[in-house]
Amino acid sequence: IELNNRINENLEQQAQAIFKSWFVDFEPFSGVMPEDWKVGNLLDIADYLNGLAMQKFRPNENENSLPVLKIKELRQGFCDNTSDVCSENIKSEYIIHNGDVIFSWSGSLLVDFWCGGTCGLNQHLFKVTSEKYSKWFYYSWTQYHLQKFISIAKDMATTMGHIKREELKKSEVLIPNSGNYSKIGNLLSPIYDMIIANRIENKRIAELRDTLLPKLM
């Protein structure tokens, strides 16, 4: 588990360096953005779906349940026996699976790949998806703007600083031509796939350990 965590830390640094090289420093283009790249915003490249108020979707007596993904679960990376539960019959778009990109936009702001198994999406969390663009692209750009979002939330008068949808619209993204998009995707996509696979493996190992340890004692 420790080794996988160290590998993932290294992979995350590599991914950020590649992103910066192409999208911030324009190193492959002698420091100048190519003319055929477009400028857009986060809402142009992805959908940000806010979760449900899950207390309204408790399971009925004879219904199967799902754990609820809240900010606490996102931070710790898994659901546990203290997590709330919801009906498994909620709309499918609110059901989260391994590898989904989740953006906590209220309170503790963070964006991450969820690798803690199937669960229901609570309010104050966005599920980030796109029909047009790949996961590496919308994850990287949301991550890129995260520090700015944290500063905006901090400056709010309320204790629960949060990000409004208009802030997503104000957040600029650069959209490469299809050739460059494929090239960058070939570099970043495998890195993020590996990070997700390592996290899922860590969860499996931890569950195995927790099952076996009591039997060995």
Language-model features and meaning:
Residues 68-70, 102-103, 127, 172, ...:
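Structured core elements
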Residues 1-53, 76, 174, 178-217:
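Non-catalytic DNA-recognition/assembly elements of restriction-modification systems
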Residues 125-135, 151, 161, 166-196, ...:
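Proline-centric
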